[in-house]
């Protein structure tokens, strides 16, 4: 199926992928590539328009230059922050360090233009935006006009109406820019003329065809974790190749309470997929003994998964592929996306824990989808809502929710505490009757391998501490800690301390992302 496409060239901003998400929300297909994508590949991609992302560097650094031939393709170009500076610099304007950095909220006064017409916030011809820049455009290129300014940035927006080139010094992709989505939609839909044909039914059709082409008659093994991503991946691959897919559900001793039974029942009842249940708790615990470094734990868990899959592969004579539920944020955090300049934060279990000598080829049908798109895909594939809207669970399971060394004792305590937390979130509603489980995007307990003094009855206790974590996010790229009611937190704390022998203190994590990540390890 032929569809209109937008190309995003990434200069290294940590929020570039939000641009892709906003474009897809307009039902237009887009791809994100490194800023140095060769011009012949750009031409072959045949985009309706190009978006140049922000980035942390200066236009005067030679290592961060895109092919300026993009300005000769006869298609609209939108430069965001660094992208605007790159456009101005290479088209004859001037860029210089600002007298003061602009970071955070700003109000832009706009002039009527093809990009801004009819788009404003509370006051006429004003936009509430999010800035993050030091350098700024100090002189316009020929053919450009100013269409927006702030007191400290006289050229905050610029336009070449004839060539349909636009530059904006702020970030429309972040939610802090109130009309950011409207501006991006104006560029993508109206200026570029892209037709909104990218929908989940269309995506399923294309993904199924691609999987069939990749796999052929080979057999595929997929590891089920019980989480949303692997479940949706299994449904999509099963739609494409049916019984060529065998799912391997590995019980590594790091699952949530009663999860093994739930996963087996759910897949047998709802999907009809072949599932092999492997009890490997002893194998995983032995390998993790004495290991405290989170990166080493992740890689050990990844390596042990591969060992398990290798053992199962020998039983499947035609197995050639290992399928995973890797999604876009996983790839981004590991700096493994199609761009070269992302900054590595931590290795993800789906992309950073694979041994170099892995015998199976990798199949990752969800790697270009954001979490909300994965859920939408799951619903379109007919999966039950309770499965699709379950909170994310990491592949290493409780292994990255137990700080430091992983022990069976710790896992058993954490399982119980986590289950109590989730129960209370499901059973407690806000004033509109919505459960706090549905109001939060991800919630879980974390085991801290430290003991604190407590008093229970007439006796002194010296037991472990559990931290509760709950966040609200639309894309898992950034997140706010959930402001849960004190009464809810109090009930959770009381139940954990009274029902889980070995825990005598419960704390609540109030860190956002950034600066913290959602998972503790």
Swiss-Prot record:
Instruction: Give start and end of each GMPS ATP-PPase domain.
Output: 198-390
Q: Which residues bind ATP?
A: 225-231
As recorded in UniProt, its EC number(s) are: 6.3.5.2
Active site (record annotation): 81, 171, 173
By its UniProt entry, which InterPro entries does this protein fall under? Class_I_gatase-like, GATASE, GMP_synth_C, GMP_synth_GATase, GMP_synthase, GMPS_ATP_PPase_dom, NAD/GMP_synthase, Rossmann-like_a/b/a_fold
Gene Ontology terms, cellular component aspect? cytosol
Q: Which GO MF terms are attached to this record?
A: ATP binding; GMP synthase activity
Taking every annotated instance into account, which residue ranges of this chain make up the domain Glutamine amidotransferase type-1? 5-197
Q: Which reaction does it catalyse?
A: XMP + L-glutamine + ATP + H2O = GMP + L-glutamate + AMP + diphosphate + 2 H(+)
* PROSITE patterns associated with the record: GATASE_TYPE_1 (PS51273), GMPS_ATP_PPASE (PS51553)
Q: Which keywords belong to this entry?
A: ATP-binding, Glutamine amidotransferase, GMP biosynthesis, Ligase, Nucleotide-binding, Purine biosynthesis
Q: Kindly list the cysteine pairs connected by disulfide bridges.
A: none
> Which pathway is this protein assigned to?
Purine metabolism; GMP biosynthesis; GMP from XMP (L-Gln route): step 1/1
- Fetch the NCBIfam families from UniProt: guaA_Cterm (TIGR00884), guaA_Nterm (TIGR00888), PRK00074.1 (NF000848)
Question: What exactly does this protein do?
Answer: Catalyzes the synthesis of GMP from XMP.
Q: HAMAP family recorded for this chain?
A: GMP_synthase
Q: How does it assemble?
A: Homodimer.
Q: What is this protein called?
A: GMP synthase [glutamine-hydrolyzing]
